[in-house]
């Protein structure tokens, strides 16, 4: 998928328009960011295949306690779009932080999809979990994370009520204790009111379930507009950057630890996640 019209609109509105895009440097950064879609997807696919093979090996030849399995669902923010490296995505940072606090091997499957909406989670990612034996089969995860809604905010044909209905069905299907995030602030964009409405619905659905809320929205609303725009966004002014994902990872780590009634690991202190992918080196970009 090429650079969308919304990326240019978001960038223009956030930064005052064409001045940021007058030079080839800014355009080049946007083009490099767009190429992340394929590179990051392939890195995660390669990693997921290796992780599934590891699970199968442990099934056949157990090595003590089974691994702590994390499954991440959602959109391009879960893929790590905007980070300088796929290992700086929040799922990778979270997995590394959890590893530091456990005496078990930690495995991560990232089934997210760039461009995903709530419909994508219900109609593609949940069935994928089921097909891989992650819902009713032998590889039931210890933790599921879900970040979704940013693309739904931009989709005018997605009614907030319909979004909530689908989310409630998803939460009912997931294992207990899932970590579900609200939608980050849209700043001065006209879709901000929809983002607030949908985030309120996420909060209500989570409160009615056995999942736990990760309030990305409150975090992003704390920043001044210039700080949020320029310090915590990638070149398209839509996706988070590495610095933002570090903050996200800590919020997820805090929620995870709180659900277990134990101190939270410090995500920033955790080493780079050792992905089981031969394609990680292909995922290096400037923030």
Predicted regions and their residues:
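Oxyanion-hole/transition-state-stabilizing segment in secreted/luminal serine hydrolases
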Residues: 120-162
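Conserved beta-strand segments of alpha/beta enzyme cores
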Residues: 107-109, 177, 210-212
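Structural recognition of the beta-strand scaffold that forms the well-ordered cores
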Residues: 71-72, 108-112, 143-147, 179-182
């Amino acid at each position: 998928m090429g650079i969308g019209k919304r990326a240019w609109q978001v960038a223009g509105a956030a930064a005052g328009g064409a001045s940021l895009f007058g030079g080839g440097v800014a355009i080049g950064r946007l083009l490099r960011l767009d190429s992340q879609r394929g590179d990051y997807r392939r890195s995660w696919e390669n990693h997921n295949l290796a992780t599934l093979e590891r699970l199968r090996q442990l099934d056949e030849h157990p090595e003590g306690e089974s691994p702590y399995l994390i499954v991440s669902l959602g959109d391009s923010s879960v893929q790590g779009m905007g980070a300088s490296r796929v290992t700086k995505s929040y799922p990778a940072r979270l997995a590394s932080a959890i590893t530091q606090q456990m005496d078990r091997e930690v495995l991560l499957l990232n089934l997210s999809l760039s461009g995903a909406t709530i419909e994508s989670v219900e109609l593609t990612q949940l069935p994928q979990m089921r097909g891989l034996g992650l819902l009713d089969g032998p590889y039931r995860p210890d933790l599921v994370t879900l970040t979704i809604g940013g693309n739904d905010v931009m989709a005018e044909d997605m009614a907030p009520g319909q979004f909530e209905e689908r989310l409630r069905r998803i939460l009912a299907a997931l294992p207990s204790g899932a970590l579900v995030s609200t939608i980050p602030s849209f700043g001065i964009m006209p879709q901000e009111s929809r983002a607030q409405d949908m985030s309120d619905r996420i909060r209500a659905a989570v409160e009615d379930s056995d999942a736990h809320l990760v309030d990305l929205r409150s975090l992003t609303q704390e920043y001044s507009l210039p700080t949020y725009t320029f310090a915590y966004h990638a070149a398209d002014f839509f996706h988070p950057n590495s610095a933002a994902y570090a903050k996200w990872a800590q919020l997820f780590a805090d929620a995870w630890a709180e659900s277990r009634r134990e101190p939270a690991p410090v995500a920033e202190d955790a080493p780079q996640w050792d992905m089981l992918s031969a394609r990680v080196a292909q995922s290096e970009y400037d923030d």
